[in-house]
Amino acid sequence: MALIRCCFEPPELPEFFDSFVQKCTDPSCCCGCCSALRPRYKRLVDNIFPVNPEDGLVKSNMEKLTFYSLSSPDKLDRIGEYLYQKATKDINRKRYKLAEIAMEAMDLLLQACHAQTTLNLFVESFLRMVQKLLEDSNPNLKIMATNSFVKFANINEDTPSYHRRYDFFISKFSSMCHSDAASMRDSLRLAGIKGLQGVIRKTVSDDLVENIWEAEHMEKIVPSLLFNMQFCVNVMFVKKNLLASGDLTPVEDATNVTPPALAEEVLRELVGRASFGHIRSVLKPLLTHLDRHELWVPNTFAIHTFRIVMISIQPQYSYTVVETLMQHLDNNFKSSPKTRTSLAVVLSKIIAIAAGESVGPSALDIINNLLTHLRTSVSTTSEITPEESQYQEALINALGEFANHHPDYQKIEIMLFIMNTVPDLSKKSKGDQMLQNILLKSLLKVGTQYSTVSFEKAFPASFLQPLLKMARAPHNPTRMVVMQILQALLDRHQNEQVLSSVSVKPYPALSQEPPSRSDIIFTHKYGANIMQALIDSMALSDRVDALTSSFNTAALLIVEMSCNETVQEFLLFILGIQQVACTVDTLGNVHKCSLHAISIGLLVLISRVSGINNLLEYAQKIVDARREEASHFLPPLLEPKKLAGKTFNLQLPHLAIDKLALGECLQNAGMDAQRLNTGAPYSLNQTDHPGHRHSWVESVSNQLTQRNSSADLTVYNGDVDSVSSSPGVCKKLLAPEFNFDAMKRALAEPTEAAKREQRERQMQIVRTFREGEFDDLMRRTEPKHDLIQNRLNELFNSLAVERQITQSDTKSSQLQASNEKPIYETNFPELFYY
């Protein structure tokens, strides 16, 4: 084989002139010795290379080549092919300066001729040259090739080539992101990140171009970006406001950009360009990278990364990130508690961002997933370890953060949804109690985020009734969480800390305003149920923290709902607490003392918030008397463990709160005391009937004044007389009139309840006469005799007056009838004549 050969072989000599005119593209051709024999584009290309490679590109000749390319765009592809051949030859011969000149020339041609229709053929040669430079081991060539590719990525092609492939560039740029070269590590990594950004911009804008969202590509791009981000000294101080728009700059010019900051910028751009169907393609390799490199513990980098994702993603797709992270938490249910806790913390940090875009079923779906994880955590562990407890707290915080960014009406729906998932009290196993406690803590987390305006909206019946049932739970922590939930929803004026301890002292920092009409109606309907649940809760435990929590709830209820229409019911509630302390034999002495202290503390509180001075004076007299004779009946509450063997004098009836005295205080203040005088104090374990105590809304005195017929006076009611003359026993109400409300109450009240009430009344009468002292019985009975006598005198006087009025009306009507003319003799006026 000849070392030098001519393009004109002997058999082709007759065609010499035709062959001479044709273009010669063989690099080993000898006709280059005569420039006149070479095509013009080759001569122009050759002229841009200097004699000394160190001198760089010949600018004047480059301008001629550019002008020729613009004038003859059909030659552009051949120019590119020839430059590629020359660069390949120079790279193989290690003449890197000449290869750099060739690459620079192609960059200039690309920038000048990017509007030409024949650019696609030139781009193929351009990309082949970039690939050739990237394949070489010289780092400068790699950086230069990357810069050239970045310039190409900034060009918007009118007719992109859909058969063009970028697999090699993705792989090569990803490998450059992991470079460990000692001298140029940061430069190579920056070049690799810039190259990936160029690929992203070139491909994601057109769906017909190569699908970069495929798993094989994302598994290279995303880990490469995360690898550079995690090498920052402190990722929390990485520049967060880098913009992903605008033309890319060469790596050499970006001297103030670090690989972590640039990688974060590219990740933002990648996530921001992802559509709904491509979000998971980015998240899956992200989660895999965090798992393989064990970056969940500590979770600083994971939180930072997911915040970038949530901020950069399109808002309507943010729910997908939360859903994917929850699925990953499902897949890691066998991982260590620390890993799951870190995952839950990451979830709590980002879930608030997604909450604003999650409405309707998606919001409850997230809540349901979080509750499912809580139930799984409780069911899979027999003993709650500190790590598992931290995991549960992280899930609860995530739930609270999610609910905090929803409107109040959705918070009510979330609380109702959680309440429906709490196990019933009939399930008394340890696991069910743990689950009850955990779910109620979740409910408390949501409740603390809710701003109560109207109690009717904050306590719908479907939510309040099961909550009050949980207030009677035998498990102390469960009851205390329920009390905290009630406190969070009742406290509209931030009085919870002011009323956090039982006291008889003034509350100067107490904030109060009169309740609205809707709140009063709510108290009429459900106040009795709430107070009954509080009494039952107080009787279940003698622990100071449990009793203090119940006192706090009762105090908030009084402060928020106290007014002239509700004060009598609250006084019956206080008397009920005292009655439980006096009559329930199963309670310990310390427990009874604590209940007496709570009752006097609530009495002082209601007398202050209601502004009834007579009531306050009476309460202060009891406090002073107890301070002298029985300090154990006053706050602070006694510790059962410290005073287990100590005995207390509990038979001190003269230091108890007297119902008649309370009624006199109200009457002296000009208020109606009928409900207090005739109603029975709350008792222990009384069944909740919303209509049972509804009669206290109406004034019984109105009913009595309407019963003024003679027939009512002839009817003897033995129960009324016996009960009225019995001390400490409430008087049985007269039969109500048959109006709509009375019929509704009669239908709602079961027959068994009336029988049970009758038996309790009889037992109470017998107990009073057996155990009470004679002087006490006389003292309590005498005022009632006077009251009955006065009432009878009023009735007889009213009957006498009515009889006189009736007789006078009869005489006047007869006289008028005799003077009137018959109707047939009446003459019509002329106005009605036709």
Swiss-Prot record:
It is a single-pass membrane protein. An essential gene required for embryogenesis; required for cell viability. SUPFAM superfamilies: ARM repeat. It is found in: Membrane. It comes from Drosophila melanogaster. Disulfide bonds: none annotated. Its main location: membrane. Expression during embryogenesis is ubiquitous with notably higher levels in the CNS and brain. Keywords: Membrane, Transmembrane, Transmembrane helix. It comes from the Eukaryota. HEAT repeats lie at residues 120-156. GO terms for cellular component: plasma membrane; presynapse; synapse. InterPro entries: ARM-like (IPR011989), ARM-type_fold (IPR016024), EFR3-like_ARM (IPR049152), EFR3_Homologs (IPR051851). This is Protein EFR3 homolog cmp44E. Belongs to the EFR3 family. The chain crosses the membrane at residues 595-612. GO terms for biological process: bulk synaptic vesicle endocytosis; chemical synaptic transmission; phototransduction; protein localization to plasma membrane; synaptic vesicle endocytosis; synaptic vesicle exocytosis. The lineage of its organism: Eukaryota, Metazoa, Ecdysozoa, Arthropoda, Hexapoda.
